[in-house]
């Protein structure tokens, strides 16, 4: 409970061991765990906290801001990686812009298209908010939407987060796109060890990884 002073004193004490190592940032995910219920991934909309009755949204904003503001007292250049706007509804919500210096949008599958899949009928028509049938196309849209809303450094899981097999062409194309995003994050399911993938993928992804590194001074300054 991030509103409980005693709990936060204990938690910040645990974090101090990591701060003392000199880390520069970490990823914030699973923001609504205090609100989880027997409804599965959908959290309760209200819950009694130490500070009183709070909405899921209010509590998550409190969580994001506490993590970021406390971290800045330990390292003035600390950055938290938080979720920007990636769906109309998401059980984890979105981070407030003032406490989200670095952002990702998720969780896409290892697929190319979105609209054509959603437009299907019958068993092919799946609720995107709950089952996550998203792809490369939706990552691009979410990044642009987040940027237009005021989020700054934004990216996505290269080739998507969910699935067993990453198509080679998709891995290459998503990498090329991500090289020009503020965040280049090669995370998620599927084979990510590039030396286990094709020689073509290894060479192209290496080139664009270096290109992204060369662009860092331009992107951040």
Where is each model-derived feature located?
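Catalytic-domain carbohydrate-binding cleft regions of carbohydrate-active enzymes
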Residues: 1-221
């Amino acid at each position: 409970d991030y509103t409980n002073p005693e709990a936060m004193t204990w938690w910040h004490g645990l974090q101090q061991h990591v701060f003392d190592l000199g880390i520069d940032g970490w990823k914030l995910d699973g923001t609504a765990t205090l609100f989880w219920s027997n409804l599965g991934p959908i959290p309760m909309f209200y819950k009694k906290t130490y500070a009183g009755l709070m909405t899921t949204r209010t509590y998550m904003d409190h969580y994001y801001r506490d993590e970021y503001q406390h971290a800045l007292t330990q390292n003035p250049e600390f950055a938290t990686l938080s979720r920007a706007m990636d769906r109309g509804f998401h059980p984890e919500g979105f981070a407030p812009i003032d406490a989200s210096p670095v952002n990702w949008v998720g969780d896409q599958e290892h697929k190319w298209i979105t609209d054509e899949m959603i437009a299907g009928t019958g068993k092919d028509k799946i609720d995107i908010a709950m089952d996550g049938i998203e792809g490369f196309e939706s990552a691009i849209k979410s990044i642009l939407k987040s940027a237009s809303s005021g989020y700054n450094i934004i990216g996505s899981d290269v080739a998507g987060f969910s699935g067993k097999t990453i198509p080679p062409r998709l891995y290459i194309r998503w990498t090329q796109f991500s090289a020009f995003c503020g965040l280049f994050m090669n995370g998620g399911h599927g084979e990510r060890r590039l030396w286990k993938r094709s020689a073509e993928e290894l060479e192209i992804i290496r080139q664009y990884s270096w290109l992204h590194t060369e662009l860092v001074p331009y992107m951040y300054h």
